[in-house]
């Protein structure tokens, strides 16, 4: 019979995405067997992050301050606003080094079935920001899913009210991809979005 405390630790690990029962059990026993100091460090880091990290009041990205570094930066373009679903989308875009504007993080996408509407995505905050008149281009970088497309359409309609240019990230064949391995939906998007050369 397994200890209730160990079971509680395993159940806690199962709360994490992509961690199933076996992985959770391996993680729990890994920490308890020979890595208790690492376990304390992990627990401390989690507790510290949960206490100190909140949301930027302007863009809703994760931040330790009321206004995050992206919004506070004087070197970023303030007339471009990239709309993303999650903070990890911001990380991915920043790693590309291509974009130097500001962000707005939805923390999800429209999903009426799950009770996620415009208010849950912070769209009233976005509307207020668009109404200020500084944003000239809104870049929609939501995921190419049904929900992501619906969310992008909703935001596009909002931007039209303020006469703001709206662009959408291109979709299609990845660089280095081979046609025979591309799914038909992606290939269809690539054909629909083709450009003159």
Swiss-Prot record:
Keywords for the protein's UniProt record, in alphabetical order: DNA damage, DNA recombination, DNA repair, Metal-binding, Zinc, Zinc-finger
ATP-binding recorded as keyword: no
InterPro entries: DNA_Rcmb_RecR (IPR000093), Rcmb_RecR (IPR023627), Rcmb_RecR_Znf (IPR015967), TOPRIM_dom (IPR006171), TOPRIM_RecR (IPR034137)
Keyword Protein transport: no
Zinc fingers typed C4-type, residue spans: 56-71
Domain Toprim residues, every copy: 79-174
A single GO molecular function term of this UniProt record: zinc ion binding
GO aspect biological process, one term: DNA repair
Pfam families registered for this protein in UniProt: RecR_C, RecR_HhH, RecR_ZnF, Toprim_4
PANTHER family from the UniProt entry: RECOMBINATION PROTEIN RECR (PTHR30446:SF0)
Its job: May play a role in DNA repair. It seems to be involved in an RecBC-independent recombinational process of DNA repair. It may act with RecF and RecO.
UniProt record similarity statement: Belongs to the RecR family.
Protein name listed in UniProt: Recombination protein RecR
Species of origin: Hydrogenovibrio crunogenus (strain DSM 25203 / XCL-2) (Thiomicrospira crunogena)
Gene this protein is translated from: recR
